[in-house]
From Swiss-Prot:
GO terms of molecular function: ATP binding; glutamate-tRNA ligase activity; tRNA binding; zinc ion binding
Family: Belongs to the class-I aminoacyl-tRNA synthetase family. Glutamate--tRNA ligase type 1 subfamily.
Annotated motif 'KMSKS' region, positions: 251-255
An annotated GO cellular component: cytosol
Gene3D superfamilies: 1.10.10.350, HUPs
Keyword Ligase: yes
Record text on subunit structure and interactions: Monomer.
Name by which UniProt lists this protein: Glutamate--tRNA ligase
Binding site for ATP: 254
Superkingdom in the source lineage: Bacteria
Entry-linked PANTHER family: GLUTAMATE--TRNA LIGASE, GLUTAMATE--TRNA LIGASE, MITOCHONDRIAL-RELATED
SUPFAM superfamilies membership: An anticodon-binding domain of class I aminoacyl-tRNA synthetases, Nucleotidylyl transferase
Top-level class of the enzyme under EC nomenclature: ligase
């Protein structure tokens, strides 16, 4: 295969959105799969809305996802600069060439005149387009209009007849009639190029071979192909990937949930899980497997398995995939992810002392199997902080009225006060001793202890839970629960 050069060119007007992240990922994977180059540049010609802060946020999000690039912003390269506002001279040169060859012209129409044209087309039931009023202005006409203070835009002269055909690598053959396009603006009155013009110049000068982007850009492609042809440039191959829809099959938006990568990062999703999920929004591996490492994806990705049909953003599936990765994640990493949420909840503060660090560590270990993303750890705070017990149901409270409960809780309290270090392994051994001493097994031992400690019949890992609560916390919980349930444990003192 030819040397593949692909790019991702975000506009720095806000955070990196899910759709943009998927486009970046597909480009990255194609380049890595076939030994090509992945370029990241910035389309910052929206001067009012663009900011370096947004640029940094987007680049940081790409790096967090593990999407690296070979050339472009932050890394440099032979086609620098990689911001459009630093490349304005190249667009001016191309526009001047088109003007000189009669393939573009200056248009002096006011916004009011253009709006009247749009309304006229709408009344006839036609798509709005430019009428061509300024197509054949004489030099005297232009001088007069400039004297009136009008600042021209530059429009591309679209052929009156014919069609522009695209052989899209995802959508197949698509054709657009030139008559429906109309002469479009390539340079605004302030000298800033429009998207359709600048992107062609950039892609051509950076030798881009494949453009992989969202389906919403398909309608831009005929305009871009006309510019390629007018400048005598070879266009890249195009692949327009499907839209991302919400579960109600409308276009993904904030009402469906978080739409930016940073929002998922802040909620404690793992980047490798989000990458795994994003690639499945439109790409099929061809089998039943759904969990892929980045290396797996690089080895398998190809455009021929990218679907035409829209992809549905399924939060339940994302949570399932992230849960799979959380189960395998290093505990220290999860503790770091949990800390901002615990700090915000006000139950810990940095720097942690030894006792607090131990508590948080074992809390995270206890809930690792129970959460889909780390922000959910706050739901478990009542189980780990404070001595208060609230029974989740009458059924849970009734567990403590079972015949064997007093001897089980007494034995548990004895073991807790023996002085051995509390670790998950030691707690596991301790609970085995309780079953042996009481001659009770399974549910008859573990359920009353769990209910006494948490007020719940189901919950996080019991060994890590007791370790996180600590000796005093666990003893106080058991005593308090027994008191609330009317369970007599006797008057034996249990020192901590």
């Amino acid at each position: 295969m030819e040397n593949i050069r692909v790019r991702f060119a975000p506009s720095p007007t806000g955070p990196l959105h899910i759709g943009g992240a998927r486009s970046a990922l597909f480009n990255f994977l194609l380049a890595r799969r076939f030994g090509g180059q992945f370029i990241v540049r910035v389309e910052d010609t929206d001067l009012e809305r663009s900011s370096r802060e947004s640029e940094d946020n987007i680049l940081d999000a790409l790096e967090w996802l593990g999407i690296t690039w070979d050339e472009g912003i932050r890394v440099g390269g032979p086609h620098a600069p990689y911001r459009q506002t630093e490349r304005l001279h190249t667009y001016r040169e191309a526009a001047d060439k088109l003007l000189a060859e009669g393939k573009a012209y200056r248009c002096y129409c006011s916004e009011e005149e253009l709006e009247a044209e749009r309304q006229a087309f709408a009344e006839k039931g036609e798509l709005p387009r430019y009428s061509g009023r300024c197509r054949s202005l004489s030099a005297d006409d232009e001088a007069r209009l400039r004297a009136e203070g009008r600042k021209p835009v530059i429009r591309f002269r679209v052929p009156d007849e014919g069609a522009v055909a695209i052989d899209d690598l995802v959508r197949g053959h698509v054709s657009f009639e030139c008559a429906g396009i109309g002469d479009f603006i390539i340079v605004k009155s302030d000298g800033i190029p429009t998207y359709n013009f600048a992107v062609v110049i950039d892609d051509a000068q950076m030798a881009i071979t494949h453009v992989i982007r969202g389906e919403e850009h398909l309608s831009n492609t005929p305009r871009q192909l006309l510019i390629y042809d007018a400048l005598g440039l070879t266009p890249p191959k195009f692949a327009h990937v499907s839209l991302i829809l919400g579960k109600d099959r409308s276009k993904m938006s904030k009402r469906h949930g978080s739409t930016s990568v940073v929002a998922y990062q802040r909620q404690g999703y793992l980047p490798e899980a989000l990458v795994n999920f994003l690639v499945l929004l439109g790409w099929s591996p061809g089998g039943e497997e759904e969990i892929f490492s980045l290396d797996d994806l690089i080895a398998q990705f190809s455009l021929d398995r990218v679907a035409k049909s829209p992809a549905v953003f399924d939060f339940e599936k994302l949570n399932w995939i992230n849960g799979v990765y959380l189960r395998k994640a290093d505990l220290d990493r999860l503790v770091a992810l949990a800390m901002p949420h615990l700090i915000e909840a006000g139950v810990v503060q940095e720097p942690l002392d030894e006792a607090a660090a131990r508590k948080v560590r074992y809390m995270v270990q206890a809930i690792q199997e129970k959460v889909s993303y780390m922000a959910q750890i706050v739901d478990f705070i009542p189980l780990f902080f404070g001595d208060a017990i609230t029974f989740e149901s009458d059924e849970a409270k009734a567990v403590l009225t079972e015949e064997q409960v007093p001897k089980v809780l007494k034995a548990c309290l004895r073991k807790l006060t023996e002085g051995r270090d509390l670790t998950p392994d030691n707690v596991k051994a301790m609970l085995k001793e309780v079953t042996k001493e009481t001659k009770e097994k399974g549910r008859n031992v573990f359920m009353p202890i769990r209910v006494a400690l948490t007020g719940q019949q189901h919950g996080p890992d019991l060994n890590a839970l007791i370790t996180a609560l600590g000796r005093e916390g666990a003893v106080n919980r058991i005593r308090r629960a027994a008191e609330l349930a009317g369970v007599a444990l006797g008057s034996s003192p249990f020192s901590c």
